[in-house]
Amino acid sequence: MPRLLTPQTPVHFIGVGGIGMSALAKILVDRGHPVSGSDPRDNPTVQHLESRGVTVFKEQTAECIQSVLATNQQPPVVVISTAIPDTNPELENARAHQLAIWHRSDLLAALIDQQASIAVAGSHGKTTTSTLITTLLIEAGEDPTAVIGGVVPCLGSNGHSGQGRLLVAEADESDGSLVKFRPSLGVITNLELDHTDHYDGLDDLISTLQRFGGGCERLIANYDDPILQEHFEPTAWWSNKQSENIAFAALPLQLDGDRCTARFYENGSAVGDFTLPMAGLHNLSNATAALAACRMEGIPFEALVEGLAQLQAPGRRFDLRGTWEGRHIVDDYAHHPSEVRATLTMAQLMVSSGRSPLPSPPQRLVAVFQPHRFSRTQQFFEAFAEALQNCDALLLAPVYAAGEQTIPGVCSNALAQRIRSLRPDLEIEVAENLNQLTDLVKQRSRPDDLVLAMGAGTVNSLWGRLTE
């Protein structure tokens, strides 16, 4: 496989509307490549790509490849993701024509190889940390290329072809393909078993991330994560618990429902204080990683402090969609028990402290959760039951299959029953579908409630359903 693309090389993405694929497509368009793709979804991402001149076929058929071959003087490179099965007719036809077929990680690896780069890996916080790094670099006067798994607020996009020396990329561990990356600087936020459809167990995940770390010129990692502390020897550590013998530390001074104030240390010496306009210790950890990465790249701390004031979380990370009949509707991507726990803890702090980024102080927390994948729900059943108790009312949607077959006994009703056994006083309702879920939100929530919709599936449509 060639490691570089010439500007004239056409590139065709099968499934171009996905968050990872669309980011790469946007960058290649900006760099002058003829770009096409296919996607049956007519979502805002696809519409944006079409407005940028990308030809998007609405069906994934063999004829798509025929059309791309007919309209380009050179044969295209065909890009796929792990979600594309071998039986996809486009992919089969591309193979029949002996076209170059790259996994999206191959294309990202090629971009990483072309310039100095920062790649962010880890089980949780990748999108937020890579978004914060991108934002801090931009606010410091840099213009990085960015390939992120969410929309970066200051860019309004998940993909950006910058003119600066750095590339910032989110390194997804879900399929193990991040071992292909050779960044100038690697970041590992934390490690916890997930994606058990790919990994045999925690040791397999650790081994994969060790291979990623071994491919980085320099590596920074979270000292507060016990798995990282035991199994990794990075170039530098960061911490939110101690500053002694730690390269970068941010020790919290005050935690509120709408911000964190912390003191930043380098090699044990206090450098200065900063305020992060985001709540939660998990976000302070993400911001500390971002500060550490930028300092490793030589960005002055003073410039970073100014940039911190402009930080916003990426899309679907505690994303205030709006206020509906007095209820604050927030969307969050949390779909692992640790993410659910951290998000609910942050939301409860907003309720208890009376301080939040919401238009008015919330009085109650109504959690709306859509479990993602039957296998994940089964594996972390008890952990989900423990995490989801931390609210004033809980509304559950059916499990979002994400292409999986159902598993007998694994369902939202079973999860609700287990949560009731742990906390009998908690008001819990289970919806049969998203329409009924929307009705339950209308019936069970009150004005001044914080309605927090969590999940990686279709629960993010709640705001649109309420306002249609």
From Swiss-Prot:
It is found in: Cytoplasm. InterPro entries: Mur-like_cat_sf (IPR036565), Mur_ligase_C (IPR004101), Mur_ligase_C_dom_sf (IPR036615), Mur_ligase_cen (IPR013221), Mur_ligase_N (IPR000713), MurCDEF_pg_biosynth (IPR050061), UDP-N-AcMur_Ala_ligase_MurC (IPR005758). GO terms for cellular component: cytoplasm. It comes from the Bacteria. Pathway: Cell wall biogenesis; peptidoglycan biosynthesis. Keywords: ATP-binding, Cell cycle, Cell division, Cell shape, Cell wall biogenesis/degradation, Cytoplasm, Ligase, Nucleotide-binding, Peptidoglycan synthesis. GO terms for molecular function: ATP binding; UDP-N-acetylmuramate-L-alanine ligase activity. ATP binds at residues 122-128. Its main location: cytoplasm. It catalyses: UDP-N-acetyl-alpha-D-muramate + L-alanine + ATP = UDP-N-acetyl-alpha-D-muramoyl-L-alanine + ADP + phosphate + H(+). Its EC number is 6.3.2.8. Cell wall formation. Belongs to the MurCDEF family. NCBIfam families: murC (TIGR01082). This is UDP-N-acetylmuramate--L-alanine ligase.
